[in-house]
Amino acid sequence: MRILHYINSLKVGNLLSDYILQLTSEQKEYAEVKSLTSTDDFQKVAEKENPDIIHIHACWDYLAAKRAQWAVKKGYAVVLSTHWGLNEPIRSNEQRIRKFIKQMMYQQKTVHQVDAMLVTNEKERQMALTLGWQKRIDVIPNSLLNSSISASEMAEQTILYYNKVLDTRYQVAMSSMENDAVYSLLHVGLARETSHNLLPSDQLLNLRSLNPAQWRRILLYSDDENIREIIDDAISRLQLNAPNIETSTIQRFALVLPKERNPLNQKKIVGTKPLTRQRLNDNINSDETIVRTIAIMLANAHQLDRKQTLSMRHLADLYTMIKYNDYDEDRLAEVLRHMRIYRFSRRIIQLLVDKLHLEEGFRPFSPLADNGLKAIMKRNFKHRY
């Protein structure tokens, strides 16, 4: 692990400086550690070192805030320690008007944008939580002020905390190879065919080339998208040498916007779309059971898309229903047009083609790849952490 600490200045005899010096000295037992101050070329060093974690130690400082925001924009994992700077007495009594202006200009935004905060006691954590700017705040005591923890223990706990941050944002580290592996595994896990040639050789080679770190990210993603049992089944069918990782034991922060865990309702259209329900009822025959079910599932998928909670599991359920049932494809398209979700449905078919390898003979109508599809991807499948 490569760690980059930033503090405005290091001064001999200063409590914060002594804390940073002790922390970084002990962390070198576990990682590559470098410290920068305001006089260093922060951006140049960060781009050269490519750290896994950037830890900012500052509050109410414009330069530190700008550097933190730059690091966030560049995709680095950024941790912020304000060292009591957000406490009520400091905000309200010390240059109150100036701090309010700084809050509006940059401080609140910085706290909100970083991956997480690290504080040194529970009181500081509660005061920071009260502001509502950041929910991901953990406590690791300062060994200089708390005799119950040694310097080495403090360093070890911060390394574990950094790993927690990195495991929370694992999607940022996922490569196209890992994403392709997920899609291949879904295709195999959902297949009802008994053929041994479910995947072309290049996709099989991709799966057999994955290392343990890549498998770890794939399985974390499978948990978050509620497709773990499908992935596990595919691993078994393909007899892949995947590591046995119990992802439930991996420490992570809660997702900002977790996916909907419930399956797509197949009986009724949920939510506040009475006109959609009415249009379905007006244009469906009683004997068109499968057409009705698919239309309902697509309507419910449309609602989840708007809530940004559409998951890979929902796509998998649609894939199974569309591929492994007999129905009148022209009637399905007609009903979806009356329901006014036909274009959305075509985009979903495109997702099934791209992500689950839905073959041409099983597509009920032509898929649609447009800006609307990009919007669905952005709302539901782009770096959710």
Which residues does each PLM region occupy?
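Short N-terminal targeting/anchoring amphipathic segment
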Residues: 45-64, 77-79, 308
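N-terminal subdomain of nucleotide-sugar transferases
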Residues: 1-39, 151-156
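Active-site proximal beta-strand in glycosyltransferases
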Residues: 3, 53-55, 70-88, 118, ...
